[in-house]
Amino acid sequence: MIVGKVNMRYVAFVAVVAAVGGFLFGYDTAVISGTIDTVAGQFSLDALQKGWYVGCALVGSIFGVSVAGVLGDSIGRKRSMILSAVLFTVSAFGCAVSATFAELVAYRIVGGVGIGIVSVISPLYISEMSVPKHRGRLVSLYQLAITVGFLGAYMANYALLQFEHTALLSGSSFVVKVFGSESWRGMLGLETLPAVVFLLIIFFIPESPRWLMLKRREDEAMAVVGRIYENRTDVETELSGIRASVGAEKRTEWRELSQKSVRKMVVVGVAIAILGQFMGVNAVLSYGPSIFSDSGLSSGDSLFYQVLVGSVNMLTTILALLIIDKVGRKKLVYYGVGGMIVSLLLIAAYFACGQTLGISPVALLTVFLAYIFCCAISICVVVWVLLSEMYPTKVRGLAMSIAGLSLWVGTYLIGQLTPWMLSTLAPAGTFLLFAVMCVPYILIVWRLVPETKGLSLEEIEKITK
């Protein structure tokens, strides 16, 4: 039991630094939406090439998340984040200067690898550096940073497009191309700035004490824990817990995964990662403009709706960050997913008969925003917290990679299937299916996921055995 003071300024600092990786994740994922048409026009892309441009980063992400656990457990959490920052920097700058479509795709894939690595390592690192009382909100900083990255990308796209339309620049210089005639270069290249900042500030944070203990570097681990806890007794208590967790019989990670209790939690993690993608949130974020158009909102500004959705997403994530350690992970899922089901049923009903009944499309937009609110306050935040908490230290990196890979596979599948579902099942059937997929998610969390609020990682490891 920790009884003394905690240096929360220091803990918050290292958490914010790691969360910058989430900002890059969000920006890199969302910025593509503002560049599709201009890139397709400049390089004369056909439909297949256009789809490849949109999806190529996902290929890199799947590879990155596949190796992230091994990287994190072999070279450490800190150096893995440094690697991801380098990849983001190379990708952003390379995209800005690409002369051919092949070069552009190659650099997008490089950035995708960075996304995959950081999506596993950043929340894992924050979880291992946090204190039990505040771990939920600290890990939630990562999801908040993703939403800020989304919003930042939408706003950067809008600003550069407006700047391009003012036609203030003329000539053929590189600056003119980046911020004027070929503004997509500026949209993609702007990521270089936060990527370089991320790379530099990582050097001011320590390695995870749990990883250091795993590598038998106890003196270094003690120094890190000593900066978190001011009481010497608390330092010893924390180190004893970590030592007991990692000092048991040495096995390979894959052999450790064969244990029944560990295998069960890995399956649960995979299930909530995949199911979370089939509850519609990424379909709404990715295909929102076309869905809004089908609803009768085509006369409005699609970019405005995008920024509106991004704003609600970000502000709700801030609320979730403030309450997750008070309300608990499972209650947020119950309330949030319950609200998602209601919202999805209302959306399906609108597409089935709302237009016939003369219901205003603004009502649909309101329900969409309510749906985003329910997602952001529950599954979008809770999934990263749970995945960073629910595995033993010795397999945490590998297990998070498996769950993260499942999440990215789910993202890929929903991205590919959504257009087909919208055309085959119609919007009404598609959103009804999303509502149905919420049911097994909430049942899995209810029956198989323990409440981890206020528990140390070592205490969580005990109750999941």
Spans of features found by a protein language model:
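Alpha-helical transmembrane bundle of multi-pass membrane proteins
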Residues: 1-220, 224-226, 246-465
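Short, well-structured alpha-helical segments
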Residues: 232-244
